[in-house]
């Protein structure tokens, strides 16, 4: 509904439960068109760290891109933007605009700058693929802190660490487009011109002239993982007799 009302594309993270897997959750990104149609979903391939206690990993079938009027869209969730093989899989499908969404992590180790780490991943993907990367990261609000204080007395101390979140847009040269947000909830505005992706590719097009696919061969299993595969079809007596009759007629 929000996509239709605002005539925009939406990429949003959700908790997804499969219709037949009632005890399994996936960390899923949905891509939604301006008409409100779900273009596709991407299930995070590997839950990060403690996420493994709650979410399961997706399969290769959701490593897809979507050809739209604003460019070829692709998305990865949070820490999997560190995975060069997953990122290259999207690049190789012609990705032009990449959406990377993250959680704010104020509880990261003191020597780990989460905001810089998020931005660095986006800069790397944009510079390597000569594409735009849109980064959206949640932030810990005062409302969240107050709610957590009901259960954890020192929640404010734990959740107010600086540089725990970054949102912004990275251009195909690896630089920030416009202004970014650090530790704040808000809206980032930036103008994207896909023509800017062309000139840098004349120098380094890792999908074409600047690669050696006679040497490197990346193979991706896009098979949907299912809990059951029927090897042999089961026939009823009537269907078996019918198949025999058909076979005899063909022999005649």
Located regions from the model:
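Short, solvent-exposed loop/turn segments at conserved positions within beta-propeller repeat blades
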Residues: 21-25, 160-163
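CN hydrolase (nitrilase-like) catalytic-core segments centered on the catalytic cysteine
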Residues: 1-11, 72, 78-191
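C-terminal beta-strand edge segments of enzyme domains
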Residues: 137-252
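Active-site glycine-rich loop that binds ribose-phosphate moieties when present
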Residues: 48-64, 81-85
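Short, acidic, Ser/Thr-enriched surface-loop or helix-capping motifs
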Residues: 31-34, 170-171
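Short acidic-hydrophobic surface loop/beta-edge motif
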Residues: 62-68, 190
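Active-site-proximal beta-strand elements of phosphoester/diester hydrolases
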Residues: 28, 41-43, 65, 71-80, ...
